[in-house]
């Protein structure tokens, strides 16, 4: 699903450093150059807002087209949860630069620091600019049964992006087998 989203969005992809191991290879497979942006000291999964803006400026100066910011507020590699204020600054910068934010929320329901931050996703702040992606195998169905879900914005670029991603998935016959579809429907109910 992430591959279809990246192919549908086109342009350059900005990733955090560190990020999930499969992000950069999928961007390359989609034909999108991937650029890494360092994370702030207090968390992973989201880029430092100032480093993001500097990276976007540099990519554009070199003739690139930064179109997608892929982040994970509940970060797998670092095991951290991005504070809402940093996440807001990052999303505000990405929206100002006309980028689509893909928020990988596979681990949003995992237990984080008790008494610490409550998960606040980018789509709750900027619903018209964020595609929410989750892999149900992360927490809801057996890992051998691949099933992912994406929630697209209802307005703006959302409908066109959804249509292009759906076309890409249909072209490769990315269909859920009936038992997986039933498990996914149950998990999402």
Q: Where are each of the predicted segments found?
A:
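Short beta-strand->loop structural element characteristic of the AMP-binding/adenylate-forming
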Residues: 33-42
């Amino acid at each position: 699903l992430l591959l279809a989203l990246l192919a549908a969005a086109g342009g350059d992809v900005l990733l955090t450093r560190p990020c999930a191991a499969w992000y950069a290879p999928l961007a390359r497979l989609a034909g999108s150059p991937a650029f890494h942006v360092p994370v702030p000291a207090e968390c992973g999964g989201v880029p430092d807002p100032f480093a993001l803006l500097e990276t976007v400026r540099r990519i554009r100066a070199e003739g690139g087209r930064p179109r997608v910011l892929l982040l994970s507020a509940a970060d797998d590699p670092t095991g951290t949860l991005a504070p809402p204020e940093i996440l807001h600054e990052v999303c505000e910068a990405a929206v100002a630069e006309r980028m689509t934010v893909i928020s990988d929320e596979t681990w949003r329901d995992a237990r984080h620091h008790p008494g610490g931050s409550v998960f606040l996703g980018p789509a709750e702040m900027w619903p018209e600019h964020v595609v929410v992606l989750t892999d149900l195998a992360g927490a809801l169905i057996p890992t051998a049964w691949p099933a992912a879900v994406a929630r697209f914005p209802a307005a703006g670029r959302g409908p066109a992006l959804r249509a292009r991603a759906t076309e890409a998935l249909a072209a490769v016959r990315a269909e859920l087998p009936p038992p997986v579809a039933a498990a996914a429907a149950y998990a999402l109910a």
